[in-house]
Curated annotation (Swiss-Prot):
It comes from Xenorhabdus nematophila (strain ATCC 19061 / DSM 3370 / CCUG 14189 / LMG 1036 / NCIMB 9965 / AN6). Its EC number is 1.14.20.10. Coiled coil: none annotated. Involved in the biosynthesis of rhabduscin, a tyrosine derivative which is a potent inhibitor of phenoloxidase, a key component of the insect's innate immune system. Catalyzes the 2-oxoglutarate-dependent oxidative decarboxylation of tyrosine isonitrile. The gene is pvcB. Its cofactor is Fe(2+). This is Tyrosine isonitrile desaturase/decarboxylase. Gene3D superfamilies: Clavaminate synthase-like (3.60.130.10). It comes from the Bacteria. Fe cation binds at residues 102, 104, 251. Disruption phenotype: Deletion of pvcA and pvcB abolishes rhabduscin biosynthesis and decreases virulence of the strain. It catalyses: (2S)-3-(4-hydroxyphenyl)-2-isocyanopropanoate + 2-oxoglutarate + O2 + H(+) = 4-[(E)-2-isocyanoethenyl]phenol + succinate + 2 CO2 + H2O. PANTHER family: GAMMA-BUTYROBETAINE HYDROXYLASE-RELATED (PTHR10696), TYROSINE ISONITRILE DESATURASE (PTHR10696:SF53).
């Protein structure tokens, strides 16, 4: 394994990814070349930095560091999202509930290449709250020809009201070419649980399938996505930084016990060139397509 001559300890994570830890006490995360880390993240899809000094609980320091990775995606709240339970949550992201597998930027005009997570404080293992990742790149490589062709010919429509900082309609093939054009990846947002209580509960419609056929398709796909060969659940430790490839991985979250000390910060980094999202368009508050908004 090529570690690109970074001064640290590197080990493989099963079933995919790398765990990078310091070579000496008090080693600062800024001692690791960003270009080398970016290459590792592109090759291994998931890079976990554990045990380094960073000071990233200060949002300004986190923002300054992540700017070295590339152009940052800006949201109405800024570039850093505090992912933590709120007393009156506006959606499931800011609650303690599970989050279904998805890709970030699906309801935006551009899709970021990386998520960079920093763990301010971690829950105990028994409290839940692991972040889940699925290596769709490898899943497709291992799929049968019939399975791949079925997925490649499947188109899914997702719709959600804009009640927080995202919303709209996405019409996307289940299998897409990676933005760099050299491999196939899966773009999928799992259905929410029926008992989900939030207004941003999204709908999932698979074109050409009746209701029972869609349910069977979703169950089959669920079993493939959660196959241990492609599925990794990250147990957070305070101070962890995780860089994940948003093009090749899907990610989600396990539910956690309410009022657990789970606090992550998340930043999105664009690729070069920026990946335009041609599958997205806005919808009006009445849920009809807003024809006055340019489709991207």
């Amino acid at each position: 394994m090529n570690t690109y001559e970074i001064d640290c300890h590197v080990e493989l994570v099963k079933p995919f990814g790398l765990l990078i830890t310091p070579n000496y006490p008090e080693q600062d995360i800024n001692s690791l070349p960003v270009d080398a880390l970016r290459k590792l993240a592109q090759d291994h899809l998931l890079v976990i930095l554990r045990g380094f000094q960073s000071g990233f609980t200060d949002k300004e320091k986190l923002t300054e560091y992540t700017r070295h990775w590339g152009e940052l995606m800006t949201w109405p709240f800024g570039v850093v999202l505090d992912v933590m339970e709120q007393s009156i949550p506006s959606d499931h992201v800011l609650d303690s509930s599970y989050i279904p597998l998805h890709w970030d930027g699906m309801y935006r005009e551009a899709i970021p290449e990386f998520q960079i997570f920093h763990c301010v404080s971690a829950p105990e293992a028994a409290q839940g709250g692991r972040t889940t990742f699925v290596n769709t790149e490898q899943l497709i490589l291992d799929a049968s020809e019939d399975e791949f062709n079925t997925w490649k010919n499947t188109t899914i429509t997702y719709r959600t009201k804009k009640v927080t900082h995202y919303g709209g309609e996405v019409v996307s093939p289940l299998v897409c070419l990676h933005p760099k054009g050299n491999k196939w990846v899966i773009r999928y947002n799992e259905p929410m649980h029926q008992e989900d209580k939030y207004a941003d509960h999204h709908s999932v419609t698979i074109q050409g399938l009746l209701s029972e056929e869609q349910k069977a398709f979703e169950e089959t796909l669920y079993n493939r996505l959660y196959d241990p060969r492609y599925f990794y659940a990250h147990q957070w430790q305070s101070g962890d930084m995780v860089i994940s490839d948003n093009f090749s991985l899907l990610h989600g979250r396990e539910a956690f016990i309410s009022r657990s000390p789970r606090h992550l910060q998340r930043v999105h980094v664009h690729g070069m060139p920026v990946c335009e999202n041609n599958s997205f368009r806005t919808i009006s508050d009445s849920n009809s397509i807003d024809s006055t908004v340019k489709e991207v």
